[in-house]
Amino acid sequence: MIYYLIISIYLIALLWIGFSKSDSIKNQEDFSVAGRSLSPWILVGTMAATWMGTGSVLGNAGKTFEIGAAGFLLPIGGMLGVLALTKIAGKARASEKLTVPEIIGSRFGDVAMILSVIALLTAYLVIVSYQFNAGGAVIYTIFHDNLGSNLSLDQATIIAALFIVAYTVLAGLLSVAYTDVANGILMITCFIIALPILFFQAGGFEGMAMSFESKGMPNNMSLFGVLSFRDVINFTLPSFLLILGDANMYQRFFASESVKSAQKATFLLFFAVVILESLIIANAWISSSMITDIAKESHVLIYAAYNFLPPIVGAIMLATIIGIIISTADSFLLVPTTCLLYTSDAADEGLGVDLGGRRI
């Protein structure tokens, strides 16, 4: 019962924040870039929560189940990408743009802008679709596999999609940013609390080593030697390139209250990503030593929340996992929405129509 209660309270709180911020939306700039009002700390929270999506809590955690301590190498690409972004953030904010296609259009013309809008729409709507699927899979796993609910996977996916769309529509980046901060704080707190509990239950490093040995996975205690150099490149290069071109990050730069704020937030983001990714992988690594069912590979943290943690801590971890997926999904939904609004306004300007930014 406590799992239902905590998750329900969490989702209701998200909706309340969305409704409370919706009255602040007066024009497209408010909706798309939060009126360019976000402080460095709010920016750090929203960028971290956006980057830490299903790839972290399901992908990296699931891979860590397979390769063990070598999983700590998986986030390196994203970390290096954030360092590179520290050189870009200030220039992006100084451009005073709303979207990445707008930047491309100002440099290469309208055709390039339209092509970039099409590319973003195609890519990001695909990403949103599998965030819906991931959200549905998590809800299904929580309520069907662990709580015995009759909820089907399709129903769970529809619930996830409806919630994500409704929440994004409420107040755009303004609501997304502030709930992302709450998600970020919840993530750090939850995974820090869970880490020593799981470590103690696993019997420390000695118990983990014995467990991995009994499962025929002794290399899971080794950081190096499991992945070849080519494997490391294969796992890290895509995330490095993704974060460099991630329109979500640029939208946050545009939303910063100043150039210096954007630069400071991106610098702090590096440390936030290092801490959060390491906590997720550490929790998954320790938990994997206690799980014998290979079918739980991609849901290792969900399984751990139910089976290895006290109910209240486990319920908060489940709410955190759902929140991570929601943060990523609504961000990837907001980007194409903003691009379409900008393109539509640009077309109206070409026709001599001036809405004064009131299309929202």
Please place each PLM-identified region on the residue numbering:
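Membrane-interface "cap" regions at the ends of multi-pass membrane proteins
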Residues: M1-V57, T168-A171, G184, C190-P196
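Extracellular loop-to-transmembrane helix junctions
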Residues: I2-K21, A34, G62-E102, M187, ...
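Residue-level recognition of pore/gate-forming positions within transmembrane alpha-helices
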Residues: L11, T50-W51, G78-V82, L120-L121, ...
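Loop-to-helix junctions at membrane interfaces in multi-pass transport proteins
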Residues: V33-L38, I42, G59-A69, G105, ...
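Helix-loop-helix module between adjacent transmembrane segments
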Residues: A49, F72-A171, P238-S239, G323-D330
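Membrane-interface alpha-helices at helix entry/exit sites of multi-pass transporters
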Residues: D110-A119, K260-L268, S344
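Conserved small/polar residues in nucleotide/adenosyl-binding loops
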Residues: Y342-D348
